[in-house]
A protein has these predicted regions:
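Non-catalytic, topology-defining segments of multipass membrane proteins
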Residues: 1-155, 159-187, 248-270
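Functionally important transmembrane alpha-helices
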Residues: 190-252, 257
Length: 270
């Protein structure tokens, strides 16, 4: 998306000006990928830590299979799965750590469901998970603008002369974890199939980058959805410029409701 941004200045919502009033091709703060390794490590470390130490609990998978994938002995896993007093559960709401041993120090195996999902199930789960995430992140994002402590953490995300794709990742670690955990919750609460999750992730990431692209993309998702449903990059660009309103990531319903009741904070994040 950075390449698209640099090669299509005519799509930019607001072009940063130089000292002599000329258009700036590359906004301040935009860096080459080779200079962003530290940022990548910061972003990935907490996610990798969770991914490599916690057993994955996918829908339609037995607790026994889950525990076996977490390096628990098959017999012990079967006993635990059938013991009503066991502390192990197949729900994601009760995390289970990998049984770390010398031979298996990290969680590298996944217990997968035996059967593939129907296309209808995948479509419904994708729609439901994005709807749930949109509502949850609306509340999370609103809190980042009204609660003093987390407001300070969120402020750097708004410090830029011109919004551009790399702003997507200009986040405090608290915000990063919030993004990922809310996305996981949205998938898990409806017991989505692992294949749905596989499709959800690239769509989720792409839409986040598109929102921060600073571009009026001809193929923007808000142009594909029914009119008024999708917020899109323009709405999010206005949010970054004003600081208030536009808390919903993908759609518009919750923001519209907040505006109707008249409680949408308007101040800019500093």
């Amino acid at each position: 998306m950075t390449v698209v941004f640099l090669q299509n200045p005519q799509w930019r919502f607001g072009v940063q000006k130089g000292k002599n009033g000329e258009d700036v091709k590359k906004p301040h703060g935009m860096r080459r990928p080779s200079r962003r390794w530290g940022e990548a490590v910061t972003y990935m470390t907490p996610l990798l830590l969770m991914d490599l130490t916690m057993i994955k609990k996918f829908a339609d998978v037995s607790l026994t299979a889950m525990l076996e994938s977490g390096n628990y002995h098959a017999a012990a896993a079967a006993i635990a799965a059938n013991n009503s007093t066991s502390t192990y559960r197949n729900t994601f709401l009760m995390p289970t750590l990998h049984n770390m041993t010398i031979s298996s120090p990290l969680q590298t195996q996944r217990a997968l469901p035996d059967l593939p999902p129907s296309s209808r199930r995948v479509a419904l789960e994708l729609a439901a998970s994005f709807f749930i995430y949109d509502a949850l992140f609306f509340l999370f994002h609103l809190s980042l603008h009204v609660i003093p402590v987390v407001k300070r953490w969120h402020a750097p995300h708004h410090r830029h002369a011109e919004i551009h794709p790399q702003i997507t990742n200009q986040l405090h670690i608290f915000e990063r974890l919030g993004l990922v955990l809310l996305a996981n919750f949205s998938l898990n609460i409806i017991k989505s199939h692992v294949f749905t999750r596989t499709l959800f992730v690239p769509i989720f990431v792409w839409l986040l980058v598109e929102l921060h692209s600073g571009l009026d993309l001809p193929w923007g998702y808000e142009k594909i959805l029914p009119k008024g449903w999708g917020g899109g990059a323009r709405k999010h660009s206005l949010h970054h410029a004003r600081g208030g309103g536009g808390y919903e990531p993908y759609f518009t319903w919750w923001d519209n409701l907040l505006d109707r009741v008249g409680h949408s904070p308007k101040e800019h994040v500093e």
